[in-house]
Swiss-Prot record:
Protein name: Undecaprenyl-diphosphatase
Annotated compartments: Cell inner membrane
A single GO cellular-component term on record: plasma membrane
A Pfam family assignment: BacA
Keyword vocabulary terms for this entry: Antibiotic resistance, Cell inner membrane, Cell membrane, Cell shape, Cell wall biogenesis/degradation, Hydrolase, Membrane, Peptidoglycan synthesis, Transmembrane, Transmembrane helix
Other remarks on this protein: Bacitracin is thought to be involved in the inhibition of peptidoglycan synthesis by sequestering undecaprenyl diphosphate, thereby reducing the pool of lipid carrier available.
UniProt record similarity statement: Belongs to the UppP family.
Membrane topology: Multi-pass membrane protein
Predominant cellular place of this UniProt entry's protein: membrane
Bilayer-spanning residue ranges: 2-22, 39-59, 86-106, 112-132, 145-165, 184-204, 212-232, 246-266
Keyword Isomerase found: no
Length: 266
């Protein structure tokens, strides 16, 4: 059973790691392992909901722009200036569908989410960040939005594996396709909104059950802490992204994995 201290710690972990390319799900499982907490995966999704609210607030103007563009499109009153937004809406839709399919498949193998597997994924994430930082990988789909969406969706779906950073692998995918970092960051987090809400709908019964099984106050406290810390974290990541210092996160992930392997004999 989760207590107040556990809730605060997990909330801080989620708030910090959601917007950093170091895998929030991997860190949550890592902390839960050492706190001897056995919590349903839907609890993690609930914490993700809190940080999604941060994204909605941070991107509120952009989301409003996209919404108004969609309304104009529905009323057949679009203009040339709406074309870019319509492409982004379509891209996010494709990414969401593909990510949902991949994520649903991966969720069937939750028993594989053990510590050694997570540490290996941390190393993979660290390598991807280095490849992103030094523009090591490029691919060209000639502007084909369907192929672009499928590729990013497939890669983002792999973020369902704990230890694989969803934001990291999505930004890596977008940049490798030619998007600039700011656009890649936008795609990564705007596409997270429908994915998290979709996960809640997909697991709606489990979502209801966590309030029956776990302490109502503690789980909401954890979500509140994740929200507050997330507001700070998202601004910090933007600065790191713009300063091209993401390789620090690779160093951290490599050090974390090696430390656990050496000192805890994993």
């Amino acid at each position: 059973m989760i207590n107040i201290l556990n809730a605060i710690i997990l909330g801080i972990v989620q708030g910090i790691t959601e917007f950093l390319p170091i895998s929030s799900s991997g860190h949550l499982l890592l902390f839960r392992h050492f706190m001897h907490l056995k919590l349903p995966i839907i609890f993690d999704i609930y914490l993700h909901l809190a940080t999604v609210l941060v994204i909605i607030i941070y991107y509120r103007q952009r989301i409003l722009e996209l919404f108004l563009t969609f309304i104009r499109f529905s009323l057949r009153k679009t203009n040339k200036s709406d074309l870019t937004n319509l492409k982004l809406i379509l891209l996010i839709l494709i990414i969401t569908i593909v990510t949902g399919v991949v994520g649903t498949f991966i969720s069937k193998y939750e028993r594989m989410f053990i510590l050694p597997f997570i540490l290996i994924n941390f190393i993979i994430t660290g390598i991807l960040i280095l490849m992103l930082e030094f523009n090591f990988f490029k691919i060209d789909f000639k502007g084909n939005i369907l192929l672009v969406g499928i590729f990013i969706g497939l890669m983002q779906g792999l973020g369902a594996f704990p230890g694989i950073s969803r934001s990291g692998i999505t930004i890596f995918s977008a940049v490798s396709l030619g998007f600039n970092r700011k656009s890649a960051f936008e795609i990564s987090f705007l596409s997270l909104i429908p994915i998290v809400f979709g996960a809640i709908l997909f697991k709606y019964k489990e979502f209801y059950d966590i309030f029956m099984v776990l302490n109502f106050f503690e789980i909401n406290l954890g979500a509140l802490v994740a929200f507050v810390v997330g507001i700070i974290s998202i601004n910090f990541f933007f600065k790191m992204l713009n300063n091209k210092k993401l390789y620090y996160f690779s160093i951290y992930l490599f050090a974390l994995s090696i430390t656990f392997c050496c000192f805890f004999r994993i």
